[in-house]
């Protein structure tokens, strides 16, 4: 659908296709869009996923719930991000986590089967493989964060990643405190206490989701 072309371009999916061929590639793919309300599940863990997903508007988080009811946030996907690729590209095609809308969100779906039939299959597949590699790097980075013993170190490493990404010492954590705590695998109270200590010690400053590394 032509209205999703800009989102698809921004996702990088067509980056190996010549610009004048974008419309041709778009018309060969089976593309649908769907709106979800905040808190709605796009997929649950173990659901079958046979399509790639791109955030058109809003944001999505992947999370896992453990036996005791504890929730860990794995990743946050913002506008134009591709997600659920590891499931769609796998042999079993089962979701490794729950994918939940962080806000009112619109998702673009592209079935893997339509990519396989597309004239530009090779170009698109190359991009998807690069995306998978990038996702693996992000997972490695999170393992490094969680491998830190001290909560303060975890916070600083995460903020430093955002600083490098945004090119500024003032960054935005697009999670509320509960979600940020779940991402760092700690309680909300522990996170709030540590953030307040760091603020008093003038290591960071913050107001809601806005953080500044001092």
Give names to the regions the model predicted.
Residues 1-38, 77, 82, 87-90, ...:
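Cyclic nucleotide-binding regulatory module and flanking cytosolic helices
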């Amino acid at each position: 659908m032509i209205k999703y072309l800009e989102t698809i371009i921004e996702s990088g999916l067509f980056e190996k296709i010549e610009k004048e061929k974008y419309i041709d590639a778009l018309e060969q793919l089976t593309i649908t869009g769907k709106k979800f309300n905040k808190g709605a599940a796009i997929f649950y863990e173990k659901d079958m996923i046979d399509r790639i997903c791109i955030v058109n508007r809003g944001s999505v988080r992947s999370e896992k719930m453990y036996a005791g009811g504890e929730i860990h946030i794995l990743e946050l996907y913002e506008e134009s991000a591709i997600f659920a690729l590891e499931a769609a590209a796998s042999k079993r095609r089962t979701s490794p986590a729950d994918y939940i809308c962080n806000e009112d969100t619109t998702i673009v779906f592209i079935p893997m089967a339509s990519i396989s039939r597309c004239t530009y299959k090779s170009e698109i597949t190359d991009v998807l493989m690069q995306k998978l590699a990038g996702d693996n790097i992000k997972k490695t980075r999170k393992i490094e964060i969680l491998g830190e013993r001290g909560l303060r170190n975890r916070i600083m490493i995460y903020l430093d990643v955002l600083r490098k990404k945004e090119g500024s010492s003032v960054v935005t954590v697009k999670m509320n405190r509960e979600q940020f705590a779940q991402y760092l695998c700690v309680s909300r109270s522990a996170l709030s206490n540590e953030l307040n200590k760091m603020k008093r010690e003038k290591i960071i400053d913050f107001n809601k989701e806005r953080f500044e590394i001092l």
